[in-house]
Amino acid sequence: MLIKVKTLTGKEIELDIEPNDRVERIKEKVEEKEGIPPPQQRLIFAGKQMNDDKTAADYKVLGGSVLHLVLALRGGF
């Protein structure tokens, strides 16, 4: 099924996923398209941060759903 991942800059990335894909796998697909390592990605759907070991189906993600991508950059001093 096709879903979209929207970045904070408004860019939309289209991904083809399966309902039983884990969130971790969705992040890997984002990395393949955008080069953002999964540990830096936070995916939000329906106002909730998605846990890596849950599946798209666990969050009731359907074809046409839009996930929001937030980058979790580690700051250092």
From Swiss-Prot:
Post-translational modification, as annotated: Cleavage of precursor form is necessary for function.
Transmembrane intervals: none
Molecular function in Gene Ontology: protein tag activity; ubiquitin protein ligase binding
One Pfam family named in its UniProt record: ubiquitin
GO cellular component assignments: cytoplasm; nucleus
Role of this protein: Ubiquitin-like protein which plays an important role in cell cycle control and embryogenesis. Covalent attachment to its substrates requires prior activation by the E1 complex uba-3-ula-1 and linkage to the E2 enzyme ubc-12. Attachment of ned-8 to cullins activates their associated E3 ubiquitin ligase activity, and thus promotes polyubiquitination and proteasomal degradation of cyclins and other regulatory proteins.
Protein name: Ubiquitin-like protein NEDD8
Organism: Caenorhabditis elegans
Gene: ned-8
